């Protein structure tokens, strides 16, 4: 049996793999900035009602984030909160980052998202078609 999280009106397992890049793919996420970003994202997630399961910077210019959230949390809003708040905090703590970027933006506009869970699409289709 799959362990589901429980809310007042539903049971769920909602995990998301999020990926986004720095503006212009600038390689600014290194050293203490990289370490601090991973800490900051964990705090931001906790403060906004979702759980950061993992976060890792790749090639100093983009980050992979794995989060678990209640179904009522909108994915674009979750990404917006993570990107906006992390940029604000990193710019305050590491003003030298701004020298590599212009326009006041740390992150590019877009992001990628994938869902993740224990049950595969094939298993869901099989279950639906069987019953």
Describe the residue ranges of each PLM region:
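Basic nucleic-acid-binding interfaces
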Residues: 1-131
């Amino acid at each position: 049996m799959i362990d589901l999280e429980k809310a007042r009106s539903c049971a769920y397992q909602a995990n998301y793999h999020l990926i986004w890049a720095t503006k212009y793919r600038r390689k600014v996420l290194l050293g203490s900035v990289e370490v601090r970003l991973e800490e900051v994202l964990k705090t931001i997630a906790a403060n906004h009602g979702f759980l950061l399961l993992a976060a890792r910077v790749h090639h100093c210019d983009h980050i992979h984030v794995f989060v678990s959230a209640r179904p009522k949390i909108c994915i674009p809003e979750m990404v917006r909160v993570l990107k906006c708040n992390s940029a604000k905090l990193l710019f305050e703590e590491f003003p030298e980052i701004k020298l590599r970027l212009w326009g006041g933006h740390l992150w590019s506009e877009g992001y990628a998202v994938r869902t993740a869970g224990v049950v595969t699409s094939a298993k869901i289709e099989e279950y639906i078609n069987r019953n």
